[in-house]
Swiss-Prot record:
The keyword S-adenosyl-L-methionine does not apply. The gene is rplL. This is Large ribosomal subunit protein bL12. GO terms for cellular component: cytosolic large ribosomal subunit. Belongs to the bacterial ribosomal protein bL12 family. It holds the Pfam family Ribosomal_L12_N.
Length: 124
């Protein structure tokens, strides 16, 4: 019985980076191949290559406080650990970055928390 490509892809998708590294090494040993990348000339402009890379760091920007400023200030305090006055200054000074250099999950969580409080938020 042959294993379907989809089954293999599903199994690989569930692996950790360490497990994937071990799998690549096993392929190299079993089949006598190398996983070294072949040097290929990149695009002339370089812009397409940058766009193809997936972003790993995000900035959560508060664009507008909305009607419930008190709830937004509380959410900013929770997310940043700022004091009351500092959080109020961030909210009053919108658009302002609330979190910078965070991963996708943290950015989405912060965005949801701020939007639930009534703010308008962008993730860049």
């Amino acid at each position: 019985m042959a294993i379907a490509k989809e089954d293999i892809l599903a199994a690989v998708e569930g692996m950790t980076v360490l497990e994937l590294n071990e799998l690549v090494k096993a392929f190299e040993e079993k089949f006598g191949v190398s996983a070294a990348a072949v040097a290929v000339a990149g695009p002339a402009g370089g812009g397409a290559a940058a766009a193809a890379e997936e972003k790993t760091e995000f900035t959560v920007v508060l664009t507008e406080a909305g009607s419930n400023k008190v709830a937004v200030i509380k959410a900013v305090r929770e997310l940043t650990g700022l004091g009351l006055k500092e959080a109020k200054d961030v909210v009053d000074g919108a658009p302002k970055a609330v979190k910078e250099g965070v991963d996708k999950a943290a950015a989405d969580e912060a965005k949801k928390k701020l939007e639930d409080a009534g703010a308008k938020v962008e993730v860049k």
